[in-house]
Amino acid sequence: MSFLKNNVEGFGSTVVNTGEVSGQGLSGAYAQTIRDGYPLFTFVMPTFLRFDAFGNGVYANGAKDELQGSALPKFNAGLTNNFSYKKFTASFFFNAVTGFVVYNNTANALLLKGSLKNAKNVTRDVVNSIENSINPGNVSTRFLEKGDYIRFANASINYAVDVKQGSFIKGLNISLSGQNLGLFTKYSGLDPEVNVDKSRNGVPSRGFDYTATPRARVFTLGINARF
């Protein structure tokens, strides 16, 4: 279990912006900043409020940029256990990460509900959206989401097979293991544990999801024989 609290210090009045945002009409747009007195990799963007009666976006404070949350988690914990029963042994590991946000650039660039309403086989939330089809997908908290998650990271089970005394095989174990077995999160993208490189002018970024490939779920069957 670990906690993280950090602030950039000694930066003076210097402000470094990073986190290039991809998408139509978003050339040169950014969503992250590094500045004195704030956590590293803090997001900066207007606060989205709602759509108006015409389906256009409404933003707080005249759509001025505001400092939002950080991409660095504040809390990280793990739970592991090993146990055995007769000839079975097993283990599992869960990890939980909270206190950070992710910018869903995939939704910003490709999943604007207003522009998808005239397509075929769309989801219910697209059909029911009041967003105007020409409403621009500006960088805003509309696409900034909590990334908190609990992951069933791995598990394994092993069985020691009985072998006859004096047989050719002295010992035999059969095992089955799995990686990335489950993910519990309210993040709307595929996986909140992403970090697509959206650096700007050589300054690194963190916490951006842009068409990222989710972690694979892997199962492994093993047989260990001793002769």
Protein language model features and the residues they cover:
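Outer-membrane beta-barrel pore domains and translocons
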Residues: 1-2, 84, 95-97, 177-181, ...
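Flexible, solvent-exposed coil segments and beta strand-coil junctions
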Residues: 54-63, 129-141, 198-205
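Repeated loop/turn-to-beta-strand initiation elements of outer-membrane beta-barrel proteins
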Residues: 87-90, 164-165
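Membrane-embedded beta-strand positions of outer-membrane beta-barrel proteins
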Residues: 92, 174-176, 223
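C-terminal beta-signal and terminal closure region of outer-membrane beta-barrel proteins
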Residues: 17-44, 119, 135-139, 185-227
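Hydrophobic, lipid-facing positions within transmembrane beta-strands of outer-membrane proteins
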Residues: 75-81, 152-157, 217-221
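Extracytoplasmic gating/loop element in the C-terminal half of outer-membrane beta-barrel translocons
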Residues: 40-42, 97-181, 186, 195
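Conserved small-residue
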Residues: 1-71, 179-189
